[in-house]
UniProtKB/Swiss-Prot annotation:
Annotated compartments: Cell inner membrane
Stored NCBIfam families: NhaB (TIGR00774), PRK09547.1 (NF007093)
Gene for this chain: nhaB
Membrane topology value: Multi-pass membrane protein
Name of the protein in question: Na(+)/H(+) antiporter NhaB
UniProt record similarity statement: Belongs to the NhaB Na(+)/H(+) (TC 2.A.34) antiporter family.
Main subcellular location of this protein, as a coarse class: membrane
Length: 531
């Protein structure tokens, strides 16, 4: 039967996506202008829900195309303007540069990272200990590096492990070329499905623990997350003061997070507790031995160079010697120059992982433009400001948390701190209350947002990365595996604020002269525009 033009159009539209998904996206494109004409506010929230839907279907169809179509239509019908989208991209240029250069830079440090983490996994047999090490290492790194950088590192390691196992299990040697994305191979070799599933589960566990670790560490310091920098600038806090003010909330949360990691692994809850199969452990151990035996002086000097560049990376970011993206660019230049990677094709491979996500983030900023232009969050902010004292802090924490679960936490944190700054300058709140609110906003945007990949850019990057389909890490599975952490981190954060512990410890820091009282004039002088 010949294919009609309409059938060909539907077949081509969004490629191999399910037909129902294609129809859903086309329906959204038809419905949105009508709803916008009737009620712009409702249309704005409808668009946000639709965009979240495209993210949830990331394994069926990469969100750039369906989300991009929704964003383009939103601009065309006037929900936001091209200038507003450009403004959002300009305000978040550091995040885009981070994705373009830092993730590519990490690609050229993969040998060192694979060396370190292979040793960690092959030498330590206890899954609980390995999980705790991944979580704590991610938290420590995220306090100095951006969470996206840390997740990029862990993804690179996981892909390395997966490809090594897949290659050997498919009947090839360590040095052979191999496509690790295909589970069917000729020559009579077939992968053991149970073994492969168990290994996928093991890698899922490690990646989720690492992802949560980035949130635990990222909330602690002003360089941990992009919104932390914006909040610190608004409040005129330096590195030490930021960490100290966050401490009454972040320290109990960190301890609780590590305890949760231990418990879910020990009792195999929420899909955790997957053991590394003995056969896979043997392959990885053999690979480590093979690499050690065949490591030439050229290989060893490459590892040394990568280690030195790694030190520069941590020092450069910890002391904020340049913007994150530019430090990433320097990592690319230093590792490739001293390790002899001068072929354009070899350089290009490093950018394959991050550029689709960079484009997706630019689309996300178009949705953020709609949220701003249609004032979708305005009612929530006004309601939260109507309360006082500890109750106000808790409400801001919860309101930030709920919105960060469905929207980018950089955006949510920026909107809230700007609104609270405006309230301070209007005389609605005192400077000390503003400082406490800044802590509530920072912790509120960073901690509950682990609930879904929407809030944490690092989680979204993980969901849309090359490793996710290989280890069967879907949107729903991420939400389920993050659930125990979401509950524990959110509740401990609320209790630290609700019980007055944050206020009491902050007062103690004032009395001990570890902190100083800031003035409203300082805040007015230090105002930055953020978004």
């Amino acid at each position: 039967m010949p294919v009609t033009m309409s059938q060909a159009f539907i077949d081509n539209f969004l490629g191999n996506s399910p037909k129902w998904f294609k129809i859903a996206i086309l329906s959204f494109l038809v419905i949105n202008p009508i709803v916008f004409y009737l009620n712009p506010f409702v249309a704005g929230w409808l668009l946000v829900v639709e965009f979240i839907f495209t993210l949830a279907m990331a394994l069926k169809c990469y969100p750039l195309q369906p989300g991009g179509l929704l964003a383009i239509e939103a601009v065309i019908i006037g929900m936001t303007s091209p200038s507003q989208v450009l403004h959002e991209i300009e305000a978040n240029l550091e995040v885009l540069l981070l994705l373009i250069f830092m993730v590519a830079g990490i690609y050229f440090m993969k040998q060192l990272l694979l060396f370190v983490f292979t040793k960690m996994i092959t030498k330590i047999r206890s899954k609980v200990v390995v999980s705790l090490m991944f979580c704590i290492a991610s938290a420590f790194l995220s306090a100095f590096l951006d969470a996206l950088t840390v997740i990029a590192v862990i993804i690179a390691v996981a892909v390395g492990f997966y490809s090594i196992y897949h290659k050997v299990a498919s009947g090839k040697s360590f040095t052979d070329d191999h496509d690790h994305t295909s589970d069917s191979h000729g020559e009579g070799h077939s992968l053991c499905e149970d073994e492969l599933e168990a290994f996928r589960g093991f890698l899922r566990n490690l990646l989720m623990h690492a992802g949560i670790g980035t949130a635990l560490g990222g909330v602690c310091t002003m360089v941990g997350e992009p919104q932390n920098l914006i909040i610190a600038a608004q409040a005129n806090w330096q590195f030490g003061e930021f960490a100290l003010r966050m401490g009454p909330v972040t320290v109990p949360v960190f301890i609780s997070g590590i305890a949760t990691c231990f418990l879910v692994e020990k009792f195999k809850w929420f899909g955790y507790g997957q053991q590394l199969p003995e056969a896979v452990h043997k392959i990885l151990s053999d690979y480590a031995s093979y690499e050690d035996a065949h490591r030439t002086k050229h290989d060893k000097i490459k590892l040394v160079i990568q280690a030195f560049v790694g030190v520069w990376l941590i020092v450069g970011l910890a002391f904020h010697l340049a913007s994150v993206g530019l430090i990433g660019l320097s990592v690319i230049i230093l590792t490739t120059a001293f390790n002899g990677v001068t072929n354009e094709h070899a350089l290009g491979k490093a950018f394959e992982e991050a550029l689709p996500f960079t484009a997706l983030l630019a689309v996300f900023f178009a949705i953020v433009g709609v949220i701003i232009d249609q004032q979708l969050f305005a009612p929530v902010i006004q309601w939260a400001l109507s309360y006082e004292g500890n109750t106000q802090l808790v409400i801001f924490y919860i309101a930030n948390g709920l919105l960060s679960m469905v929207s980018d936490n950089v955006f949510v944190g920026t909107v809230y701190i700007n609104e609270v700054k405006a309230a301070l300058l209007d005389g609605q709140i005192t400077r000390d209350q503003f400082d406490l609110l800044a802590v509530a906003i920072n912790t509120g945007t960073n901690l509950p947002s682990v609930a879904t990949p929407n809030g944490q850019a690092a989680f979204l990057f993980l969901l849309t990365s090359a490793i996710a389909p290989l280890i069967r890490l879907s949107y729903g599975r991420m939400v389920w595996m993050a659930l125990p952490y979401t509950i524990v981190l959110s509740i401990v954060g609320i209790l630290a604020i609700e019980t007055g512990f944050l206020g009491e410890m902050t007062q103690y820091f004032y009395d001990s002269h570890m902190l100083i009282h800031h003035s409203v004039a300082e805040a007015a002088k230090g105002a930055v525009t953020g978004h």
